[in-house]
Amino acid sequence: MIVGGEVRSDDAYVDIQKVVRDTVNRIGYNKAEYRFDGNSCGVMSTLHEQSADINRGVDRKSKGEEDLADIQGAGDQGMMFGYACRDTEDYMPLTLYLSHIALRVLARIRREKNSRMPYLRPDAKSQFTVEYDGETGKPVRIHTIVISTQHDEFTSDDFFMQSKIRKDVKEILIPEMLKKIPESEAALFKGEYDEESNPEGYILHVNPTGKFVIGGPHGDTGLTGRKIIVDTYGGKGAHGGGAFSGKDPSKVDRSAAYAARYIAKNLVAAGVADELLVQVSYAIGVARPVSIFVNSYGTASCDKNGEKISDAAIAGKIGELFDLRPAKIIEKFGLKNPIYEPTAAYGHVGRKPYKAEVELVRGGVRTKKEVQFFGWELLDAVDQVREAFSL
């Protein structure tokens, strides 16, 4: 494991070796037969101090009565996007929502005592294809399911191995999935496809290459920055190209993308539109965004005069309602708290917000603090938005 990057801190000490090894083991890479495990893997740290040239635009000192939020500039230039739609209760695209549910259930089955699928290893991927009605835009059925899951070496032949895993996915994983989702979404699963008896059923692909024994960090070199669509909206909306993980909140790649999701979700929940893409862009060292762009895909509501609200009008209201300076984003969502580990799997957006107690260490002193996780998923601006748009 190579831990690299630039950091700036006056008094922090982190036991990199322990953090890495504990995390790898907790994920599930804890057996020598995986050819990579937390107990025996090498850990190399190349962390070094952040460039002073970058830091000078982010960590400026006040020179009088200036607003401190105006002094802290964006940590980089770029475009960030937030998206929301009415596919699910979480205002997320259905395809990505189902993909995350499938992997969560698969991981739970793997960790069960006396697991029903005891051959499972930690690495896994999923992909769902949904057929939509061309006129209403509503989902009609699940078209294709792809599940690729790492597994132990079987002593029998490959055909038996493939058949066994496929049978378990169909009879264990998918039924467990259906228990986790609303009835309206479960109804889209219309059984497995058969050309004659069930042409409306889903096509199921399980480990399409036929074998998946070598996986995880032994099979692939890292994921950070290489799966940015899985981290966000699964291909819906848009992405500015900047990965989230591995960045502190001064980097607007992360913090502004969270803020844009918060805005899009609250506007859709308030009824401004059924689908909304929010784009913000920044210049390094400059606090306020240089632009705000909105695409409602023709789904915007009508104002009190019966006229459809324009995307330009929505963008203008966003600029009035939400403070998008990095310091204010960080303050609103508590982004300096240790809240990021859960974002490393199952996506950064579309998650359930919750509060939990964490341990903080400063100057060798340990303290407990309750912090908000996934605060950008809260729907606490809906009333404010409805009032602003007279809805």
Predicted regions and their residues:
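Conserved mixed alpha/beta catalytic, RNA-binding, or beta-rich assembly cores of soluble enzyme
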Residues: 174, 221-274
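Short, conserved charged micro-motifs
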Residues: 10-16, 91, 153-165, 300-313
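Structured core elements
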Residues: 2, 44, 80, 127-129, ...
